[in-house]
Design a protein with these regions (language model features):
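Positively charged, low-complexity intrinsically disordered leader regions
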Residues: 2-77
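Short, acidic/turn-prone active-site loops that include or flank metal/cofactor-
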Residues: 92-94, 142-147, 203, 222, ...
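Glycine-rich phosphate/diphosphate-binding loop of Rossmann-like nucleotide-binding domains
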Residues: 65-77, 161-234
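Phosphate/diphosphate ligand-binding glycine-rich loop within oxidoreductases
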Residues: 49, 53-160, 280
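A short helix->loop->beta-strand "cap" motif at the edges of active sites that frequently abuts
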Residues: 136, 194-196, 265-271
Length: 322
C-alpha cells in the first residue's frame, strides 16, 4: 500500500481489524500499534507536514446522531489530510426522518461507494450493529455510555507523550462516571498498558460496580490528589439524565472541581486533561485549564493524529480482507 509518509513503515501484519468499535476487545499489541502509528502522524505535524496521499480515492462518511464539534471536525480533517474525501451525513434531513432504518441507510451509503463510516449514536451497540450488516469499515465515534475509543486513544497518547511508559502510573478519572463512554474507553485502554485507575465522583455517579473492571473507586477528590499522576476531568452530562445527581453545580464544583488550591496540593508534575467540552468554573478553573500542567490543546492535536491512524489501519485491513 502506497503512502508518502515512510515513517509509517510496512502495514502491521498484526493489525487485522477493519472496524474500530471499542478498546475493550483490543489486544495490548493492537493498542500499541494504534498509539505508535498515531505518534508518527503527530511527529509529522510537528515537523510542518500536514497533507499526505495515503488514502487517495477513499470516501468516509460521518454519521452523527448526537451533537459534536471536536470529534466530527477531527475525523473530517483526518480524512482530508490522508488524501481522502469526507461527507457529512445530516440525519435530520435524511430518509431516516421518513422511517428508514439506520441499517438500510448505511447499506445505501455503502452502495454509493463509501469505504468507511464514522458513527456516533445515543444508543449503545449501533456501530456494532452496522459492522455486522455492511462491508465498509465502521468506526465508533461514541455510542451512548458504552465507548468512545478514539477519545480514549488520544487521552492515552497524550499521557504517554508526557509521562513515557504508563506501567505503574495512577490515573484518576473524575466526574460523571456513570454516563461516560470516555471513562470506559480510558479504563479499558489504561489497564492494558499496566496503569492503575481510580474513578472518582459523587456516589450518585460512581458505583462500586466499577471494581468489576479492575479499578478503584472514590467519592473524594481530595483523598486521591496526592496519589494520581494524571487527572482526567469529565463534564457532567445533563443531557443523559432526568434529574440532577447532586444538589447544585456550586456544590459539585466545591467537592470535585480542580482549582489552583487543589493543584498545589497534588503531585508537582500532575498532568491534567479533559475530553471537552469543558465547563470552566465547574470541573476546571481557568487557572488549571490554561496552566502549564494542562494538556487539553495537546489532546485536540493528538485527536487528529489518532483518527488518521485509525482510518489508515482500518482501511488497510478492509482491503486485505476483501
Amino acid at each position: 500500500m502506497f503512502n508518502d509518509l515512510p515513517e509509517l513503515g510496512e502495514f502491521p501484519a498484526a493489525w487485522k481489524r477493519k472496524h474500530l468499535l471499542g478498546l475493550e476487545d483490543l489486544t495490548r499489541e493492537e493498542l500499541l500499534i494504534l498509539l505508535d502509528k498515531a505518534q508518527v502522524f503527530r511527529d509529522a505535524f510537528d515537523q510542518g507536514r500536514r497533507k499526505f496521499s495515503i488514502l487517495p480515492g477513499h470516501t468516509s462518511v460521518t454519521l452523527f446522531f448526537e451533537n459534536s464539534t471536536r470529534t466530527r471536525t477531527s475525523f473530517s480533517l483526518a480524512a482530508q489530510r490522508l488524501g481522502a474525501s469526507c461527507v457529512a451525513f445530516a440525519a435530520s434531513t435524511s430518509s431516516l426522518s421518513k422511517g428508514e432504518s439506520i441499517v438500510d441507510t448505511a447499506k445505501n451509503l455503502e452502495a454509493m461507494g463509501c469505504e468507511s463510516m464514522v458513527v456516533r449514536h445515543s444508543t449503545p451497540g449501533i456501530p456494532k450493529l452496522l459492522s455486522e450488516n455492511v462491508h465498509c469499515s465502521i468506526i465508533n465515534a461514541g455510542d451512548g455510555a458504552h465507548e468512545h475509543p478514539t477519545q480514549g486513544l488520544l487521552d492515552i497518547l497524550t499521557m504517554r507523550q508526557r509521562l513515557g511508559s504508563l506501567e505503574g502510573k495512577t490515573v484518576g478519572v473524575v466526574g460523571d462516571i456513570a454516563h461516560s463512554r470516555v471513562a470506559r474507553s480510558n479504563v479499558w485502554g489504561l489497564k492494558k498498558l499496566g496503569a492503575n485507575v481510580i474513578v472518582c465522583g459523587p456516589s450518585t455517579l460512581v458505583s462500586p460496580r466499577w471494581e468489576e473492571m479492575g479499578v478503584e473507586y472514590s467519592h473524594s477528590l481530595d483523598k486521591i490528589l496526592t496519589r494520581v499522576d494524571v487527572l482526567n476531568m469529565l463534564r457532567i452530562q445533563f443531557e443523559r439524565q432526568y434529574t440532577s445527581p447532586f444538589p447544585s453545580i456550586r456544590e459539585y464544583s466545591l467537592l470535585f472541581g480542580m482549582d489552583g488550591d487543589r493543584l498545589r496540593r497534588a503531585k508537582p508534575d500532575l498532568l491534567v486533561i479533559a475530553p471537552g467540552p469543558i465547563n470552566r468554573g465547574v470541573e476546571l478553573t481557568p487557572e488549571v485549564a490554561d496552566g502549564p500542567q494542562s494538556a487539553i490543546l495537546d489532546q485536540v492535536s493528538n485527536g487528529l493524529a489518532v483518527r488518521m491512524a485509525v482510518l489508515w489501519l482500518t482501511d488497510g485491513a478492509r482491503k486485505l480482507s476483501s
